[in-house]
Amino acid sequence: MTYTVDTPRSRRRRLRWPRLPLGEGQAAWTTRALMLLAPLLSFTLVEYLNYNNPWTDFTPLQIALNLAWYYLGELFFYFVLRRRASAVKWAMGIAWGLGMANHYLISFRGRTLFPGDFLTLRTAANVAGNYDYRPDSMQWLTIGVFAAVLLALSFLPNEKKRPFPWRLFVPAAGAAAVYLGVFFGTGFVESRGIEPSMWKIGRAHV
């Protein structure tokens, strides 16, 4: 008679998280599609938290300028992590987190987060206890969407870390440099009647 010893390792094998049976090529195209679509969803969630409808409240130029930041952030994480699914998770998570912070700031102060606010963190910490931080229905909706995205990503096959993609990095870095130069170093944005620090805050204009 033989006996099977139930070890922690064997239990982990039985409880392995299910993965989609995708081939290497299928998984690659799936993560590429996610990298293309995720910034659109991130932009929608963030602007929804800012009390805006991004697809009707903004001009096409404003939408393009906003989306550029989301794609740049995602590319940054891709070059650092060298995994497409991980880049999607980190870029979306940080964008969503900033959207949540802005949602509170708009509710409390009527405006979004500005770079100068980081210089007054001590003052902000002193008054932070005076506010109600319970999530509202808008926040719960975005929490559900973000959680659903993370759950969907968890079913993808494990992704190997790729060699650094120099062939993609060089043109991406060049395009980013041009965009940042035009955005901050010229009057192009202001000449179109757009405030670089804040496109529009729906609730602040009510």
What are these regions (language model features)?
Residues 2-202:
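Transmembrane and membrane-interface helices of multi-pass
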Residues 204-206:
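Conserved small/polar residues in nucleotide/adenosyl-binding loops
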